[in-house]
């Protein structure tokens, strides 16, 4: 049982790390050269000064929705980890971790929806930056976090507390 708790906790911490990096780092869309776009800033590399020049992203409604969904997924994942620890130490033997599992399933839905909205609107990014580009590693991390959070939520729902 202690090995299972260790694995579930490690999986949850891995999901948290993936979500933090995916939400806060600067590579949701990479352009040719060293330029990249993220959820918060549009950054370009200035060769003359050897510095990054960043500006706020446009006021697209869909981009604001992706921002909100990714932050919501972080909050829900943190909440589910806190709930798991609370339930682990206060719940009676034989109890199920329904609240933790439900929060983690909501996390997976929020990540899925945010990444899907971003993928659907990739053509708008290409209109603004016609030089091309591709999805960055933060976008890929969001897609990796989705199935992990889904599996984690299902595991939590089926997990019983034993002594």
Swiss-Prot record:
Q: Which Pfam families match?
A: PMP22_Claudin (PF00822)
Where in or outside the cell? Membrane
Give TM segment ranges: 4-24, 66-86, 100-120, 139-159
A single GO CC term for this protein reads: plasma membrane
> Which keywords label this protein?
Glycoprotein, Membrane, Transmembrane, Transmembrane helix
Q: Which domain of life is it from?
A: Eukaryota
- Where it mainly occurs, coarsely classed, is membrane
Listed GO biological process terms: apoptotic process; bleb assembly
Gene3D superfamilies from the UniProt entry: 1.20.140.150
Q: Where does the record say carbohydrate is attached?
A: 47, 56
Query: Tell me, what does this protein do in biology?
Result: Probably involved in cell proliferation and cell-cell interactions.
State the family named in the UniProt similarity comment for this chain. Belongs to the PMP-22/EMP/MP20 family.
The name of this protein is Epithelial membrane protein 3
Q: Which organism is it from?
A: Homo sapiens (Human)
Query: What high-level taxonomic lineage is stated for the organism?
Result: Eukaryota, Metazoa, Chordata, Craniata, Vertebrata
């Amino acid at each position: 049982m202690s090995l299972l708790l260790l694995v579930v906790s490690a999986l949850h911490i891995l999901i948290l790390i993936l979500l933090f990096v995916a939400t806060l780092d600067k590579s949701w869309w990479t352009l040719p050269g060293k330029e990249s776009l993220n959820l918060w800033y549009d950054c370009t590399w200035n060769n003359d000064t050897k510095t990054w020049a960043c500006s706020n992203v446009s006021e697209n409604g869909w981009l604001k929705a992706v921002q909100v969904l990714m932050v919501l997924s972080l909050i829900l994942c943190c909440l589910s980890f806190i709930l798991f620890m609370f339930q682990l130490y206060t719940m009676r033997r034989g109890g199920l971790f329904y609240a933790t599992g439900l929060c983690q399933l909501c996390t997976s839905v929020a990540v899925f929806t945010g990444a899907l909205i971003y993928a659907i609107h990739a053509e708008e990014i290409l209109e603004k930056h016609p030089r091309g580009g591709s999805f960055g590693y933060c976008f890929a991390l969001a897609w990796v976090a989705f199935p992990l959070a889904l599996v984690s939520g299902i595991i939590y729902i089926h997990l019983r507390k034993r002594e």
